[in-house]
Amino acid sequence: MTENEQIFWNRVLELAQSQLKQATYEFFVHDARLIKVDNHVATIFLDQMKELFWEKNLKDVILTAGFEVYNAQIAVDYVYEDNLMIEQQHQGQQGYTEQAFQQLPAVQSDLNPKYSFDNFIQGDENRWAVAASIAVANTPGTTYNPLFIWGGPGLGKTHLLNAIGNSVLLENPNARIKYITAENFINEFVVHIRLDTMDELKEKFRNLDLLLIDDIQSLAKKTLSGTQEEFFNTFNALHNNNKQIVLTSDRTPDHLNDLEDRLVTRFKWGLTVNITPPDFETRVAILTNKIQEYNFVFPQDTIEYLAGQFDSNVRDLEGALKDISLVANFKQIDTITVDIAAEAIRARKQDGPKMTVIPIEEIQAQVGKFYGVTVKEIKATKRTQDIVLARQVAMFLAREMTDNSLPKIGKEFGGRDHSTVLHAYNKIKNMIGQDESLRIEIETIKNKIK
């Protein structure tokens, strides 16, 4: 691409993005490519079904960019995957170059190259999902098919989808891979219906080696006739040919209430794994990894403070670091203290769910009352079985129900260090998963505290 062609195309994209909603831009413009500008004609490669949208909505954009760069009216010649090779054969060196064609893969995977297994932080809450994803990437279509990953927003489902795709692509650069949200699958279905080009949609999705569908619950929300039918047929075509399918959702297959039963049944053919919010240790590990992207010093107490402020998902942690970076750059600060971090994230905390301020003393009192021990005994060093349990439950609840840092909590329990609090928290958390009676006890205490 010449310098003028690059300037022209960048201007087209800039103008399009300023005029379209982000979702519309991503769907209709993101995958388009400029091949060349010759004799005042811009040759643009895109999906055939999107040509009508470009003609109707982006003609003025191309005209504007053309006059700005070439001082001429630029016409457009749209080419598609199936006719690009034909044009090249007819035009030889005067037409499209081999290099240009190679830059246009048979399938636009839409994978994000920054996501890999290497930079995904593992913890107890996502260990099985990671293991299953790696197994699928190593032997697609044979191990778990489909793989269904569910969990709340911001927990790493999209990261794992892309990591699977990038891993497969690394081993087999010719693999036909497609990452797409269920919402965009629906959008493509609608466009193909309107253009009467459903055969193209079938060709595109039913000949894949790996299909990665994000937020499949969006498919359940749609009542458009034929959408679920088309996905059902796509699923069957791929599965029958031992092609790997990976799906993510914010709920289990059984809770996709508006989805046809036959789809739900197929989603459960393979393996279903859950990702839950990261525990404190994992949040610390995530932050320790993320701060390497910033040119600031983060002392350990600051990292632990931040890990204690956001416990619902990874996006909150990433957003907090961006807030801190903004404040630190403005103040020209190199070392991020707890006070600086607290100032930087104040607005984010105010925008988020409000946490009722609960004194640790109140937690200790309610736990002691429930287990028949005194607050003094909870804070002391005595290690009889009933006191140790009460002490660890109180530490667990102090971590769960307040935004105090681990060192602060330890100080309220007789001056214990943060590692003792962390050990107690993890121990009780693990016990809750195995002991239903303990879980009920802790819920009872929490209700009394609230």
Swiss-Prot record:
Region (Domain I, interacts with DnaA modulators) residue spans: 1-84
Q: Name one GO cellular component term.
A: plasma membrane
InterPro entries attached here?
AAA+_ATPase, Chromosome_initiator_DnaA, Chromosome_initiator_DnaA-like, Chromosome_initiator_DnaA_CS, DnaA_C, DnaA_dom, P-loop_NTPase, Trp_repressor/repl_initiator
Specify whether Manganese is a keyword of the entry: no
Main subcellular localisation: cytoplasm
State the disulfide connectivity.
Answer: none
- The yes or no answer to whether the keyword ATP-binding is present is yes
Could you tell me which PROSITE patterns the record lists for this protein?
A: DNAA
Spell out the SUPFAM superfamilies in the cross-references.
Answer: P-loop containing nucleoside triphosphate hydrolases, TrpR-like
Keywords from UniProt, A to Z, are: ATP-binding, Cytoplasm, DNA replication, DNA-binding, Lipid-binding, Nucleotide-binding
Q: Where does it localize?
A: Cytoplasm
Drop me one GO molecular function for this one. Answer: DNA replication origin binding
Positions with a binding annotation for ATP: G154, G156, K157, T158
Q: Which Gene Ontology terms describe the biological processes this protein takes part in?
A: DNA replication initiation; regulation of DNA replication
- Locate the region Domain II: 84-109
What are the start and end residues of every segment in region (Domain IV, binds dsDNA)?
Answer: 329-450
Region ranges (Domain III, AAA+ region): 110-328
Question: Function of this protein?
Answer: Plays an essential role in the initiation and regulation of chromosomal replication. ATP-DnaA binds to the origin of replication (oriC) to initiate formation of the DNA replication initiation complex once per cell cycle. Binds the DnaA box (a 9 base pair repeat at the origin) and separates the double-stranded (ds)DNA. Forms a right-handed helical filament on oriC DNA; dsDNA binds to the exterior of the filament while single-stranded (ss)DNA is stabiized in the filament's interior.
Give the matching NCBIfam families.
DnaA
Cite the record's note on assembly.
Answer: Oligomerizes as a right-handed, spiral filament on DNA at oriC.
Per the record, the domain comment is: Domain I is involved in oligomerization and binding regulators, domain II is flexibile and of varying length in different bacteria, domain III forms the AAA+ region, while domain IV binds dsDNA.
> Could you tell me which PANTHER family the record lists for this protein?
CHROMOSOMAL REPLICATION INITIATOR PROTEIN DNAA
> Into which family does the record put it?
Belongs to the DnaA family.
What name is this protein filed under? Chromosomal replication initiator protein DnaA
- Organism annotation: Streptococcus equi subsp. zooepidemicus (strain H70)
